[in-house]
């Protein structure tokens, strides 16, 4: 009992220490300059909220077909915004930034055991296009489901954007799940393609992702192709 008590005291002290956070992470000047919404926006939105959001949507999003209807509130609480517009998420995340910000870093990645990457919009665009073209060559079409079973690597971002680019539906499966759990999710989604890796670092160990996928294939009949990151 005494040992448990001491351990409990230690754990309580550790929890309290974690609750006290004194570090500061100041935002960049660029972020500060662009973070706050001007007061004129509030005035504009209060006068005509639908017109305000129409303006924001048309100026801040790239459309293949601009919407003519702002809000469909005919079936509350199932509201639909810009329902007759057409766009592509991957295009808005990547293509629209290339001309002015192609060399700008889209995101920083740090993995185990300490490797890092700085991925620009141009780099990400090229990777996404390469994978989306590969998916199309494998017969993946709009509406098809793709299971993504990866570690926390840049390829998981590439995979999601590549699916969005061709209209495929991606289903991200946690890389720590077993073959059985992965198979359950493949079957639920009826995924015809799986994107995985030969392995992934997690808490100092390498998770055998590809081996887990191989095990899941024995429990599903939907998968036609497996793409492996090495």
What are these regions (language model features)?
Residues 90, 107-161, 178-183:
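Conserved AMP-binding/adenylate-forming core of the ANL superfamily
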Residues 165-230:
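Structural core segment of the AMP-binding/adenylate-forming
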Residues 98-100, 135-140, 184-192:
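Glycine-rich phosphate/diphosphate-binding loops that line cofactor/substrate pockets in enzymes
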Residues 46-65, 85-107:
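A short N-terminal helical cap/helix-turn-helix that marks the beginning
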Residues 1-10:
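Short, Lys/Arg-enriched N-terminal segments with co-localized hydrophobic residues
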Residues 11-81:
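N-terminal amphipathic, basic-rich helices that act as targeting or association modules
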């Amino acid at each position: 009992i005494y040992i448990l008590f001491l351990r409990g005291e230690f754990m309580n002290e550790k929890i309290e220490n974690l609750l006290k956070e004194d570090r500061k992470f100041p935002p960049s000047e660029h972020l500060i300059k662009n973070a706050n919404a001007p007061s004129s926006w509030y005035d504009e939105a209060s006068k005509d909220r639908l017109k305000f959001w129409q303006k924001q949507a048309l100026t801040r999003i790239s459309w293949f077909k601009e919407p003519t209807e702002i809000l469909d509130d005919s079936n509350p609480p199932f509201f639909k915004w810009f329902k007759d517009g057409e766009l592509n998420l991957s295009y808005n995340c990547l293509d629209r930034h290339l001309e002015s910000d192609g060399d700008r870093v889209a995101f920083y990645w740090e993995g185990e055991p300490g490797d890092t990457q700085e991925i620009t919009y141009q780099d990400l665009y090229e990777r996404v296009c390469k994978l989306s073209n590969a998916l199309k060559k494998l017969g993946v079409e709009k509406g098809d489901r793709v299971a993504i079973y990866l570690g926390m690597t840049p390829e998981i971002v590439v995979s999601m954007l590549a699916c969005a680019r061709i209209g495929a539906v991606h289903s991200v499966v946690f890389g720590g799940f077993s073959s059985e759990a992965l198979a359950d999710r493949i079957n639920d989604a009826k995924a015809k393609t799986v994107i995985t890796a030969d392995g992934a670092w997690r808490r100092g160990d390498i998770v055998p992702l590809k081996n887990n996928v191989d095990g899941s294939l024995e429990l599903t009949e939907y998968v036609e192709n497996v793409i492996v990151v090495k």
